[in-house]
Amino acid sequence: MEKKYILALDQGTTSSRAMIIDEEGEVIGVAQEEFDQIFPKPGWVEHNANEIWASILAVIAGVLLKTNISSKEIAGIGITNQRETTVIWDKESGNPIYNAIVWQSRQTEDICKQLRKDGYEDTIRSKTGLLIDPYFAGTKARWILDHVDGAQERAEKGELLFGTIDTWLVWKLTGGRAHITDYSNASRTLLYNIYDLEWDDELLKMLNIPKAMLPEVRPSSEVYADTVPYHFFGEEVPVAGIAGDQQAALFGQGCFEKGMAKNTYGTGCFLLMNTGEKAVRSENGLLTTLAWGIDGKVEYALEGSIFVAGSAIQWLRDGLRMVRQSSDSENYASRIESSDGVYVVPAFVGLGAPYWDSDVRGAVFGLTRGTEKEQFIRATLESLAYQTRDVLYAMEQDSGISLKTLRVDGGASANNFLMQFQSDILGVPVERPENKETTVLGAAFLAGLAVGVWKDKNEIKKHWKLDKRFEVEMKEEQREDLYEGWHKAVKAAQAFK
């Protein structure tokens, strides 16, 4: 039987999905399963790693049954995952010693404060490209080793294993034969030197993490090991591609050349720009990260995150009840010519890149007696585009690369008003693909390259299909006037604390 399909596993923050992708890069079938969020204390977020594994087994079975595709027809498996979420488990039994600590969780704030106090910020920045923040995996591992009796000693003896979710899934799928991660996930740990491409002894010592528990770091596209047959309907299928979710989306968007960038409009926004084989150190509060490693070389990216994007539209729907469903926002915003000087700064949980101001809160400026909900809704949508310009401007400053086009995906990229305004406020075209499942496609393409479904990146590029290209319609003078108003609004919001 011909092996012509790739199974892509997308392990996200609230659900796990499995998709089958054919040789044309089309999604043939999908299965999805949600799992529980655990909130032990305010600001803490955890997952049961065994429940995540059970959800993965369920969606693998579900998608094969739904599509009536045999496991014999699967050429390889690609994995993309919620990044930074951390699991530590017993090497012999395979049982986690504590819940997985999720990327959003703030429970390691005290460890981060101590690292800052001890003066490690420059060391971490210069070796990992990251900031000291509870977001990243290293402090989560330290927290588990501190809070589970005997864990540190067991880790030092080599009895415990550490991994981000990709590592956990590969270990389970292969029956413990492969304890590995890829470059993109390793670069999110605070423990990996992105220049020397190795676990860094100074960083490990800083957090007192035993090297014996760390996975081997491998390319993002390579056959790592085969699945154990009893997990896969009797078949041994190669696990052949891994990338963290945002890097997978960059790959799935075909952003293979230096200077190409994508923005994922989800709950927040994640912007990544490919900077090629050279890591760009940010002077503007952006993260320097590994994009992927393929064919014996690695490529780097600059990353900026916006905390509130799609969640601002949910706020219009659920909090203010201005729209019945999120998609109605496009209709309201398009009814009027402009926001009439209204600016919404959606800093509900502070502002991310390039401001990194966790104390600022949301604000609305420019209201008059004539302001109606259309202006309010439009200004809220526009705030997503302004924040995107803030980050992209910082990327251009850092990299010296001028953006030619922005590729977009994620839920809010379906909003035509927002995409047109995004193009206008950036002054560059915005391209939306037909297939918005770019994260899953990225994982599938990485696996498919390793097992020969696709020959090279040029062949993959052909499977990126344009849905709509939004050309710049706004004059430069108007663009800069609007953007200057946004900056005034942000400064005013920052002054009110």
From Swiss-Prot:
It is an enzyme of class 2 (transferase). Belongs to the FGGY kinase family. ADP binds at residues 13, 17, 267, 310, 411, 415. Keywords: ATP-binding, Glycerol metabolism, Kinase, Nucleotide-binding, Phosphoprotein, Transferase. Key enzyme in the regulation of glycerol uptake and metabolism. Catalyzes the phosphorylation of glycerol to yield sn-glycerol 3-phosphate. HAMAP family: Glycerol_kin (MF_00186). Homotetramer and homodimer (in equilibrium). The keyword Transferase applies. GO terms for cellular component: cytosol. Transmembrane segments: none annotated. One of its GO terms (biological process) is glycerol catabolic process. This is Glycerol kinase. The gene is glpK. It catalyses: glycerol + ATP = sn-glycerol 3-phosphate + ADP + H(+). InterPro entries: ATPase_NBD, Carb_kinase_FGGY, Carb_kinase_FGGY_CS, FGGY_C, FGGY_N, Glycerol_kin. Glycerol binds at residues 83-84, 135, 245-246. It comes from Listeria monocytogenes serovar 1/2a (strain ATCC BAA-679 / EGD-e).
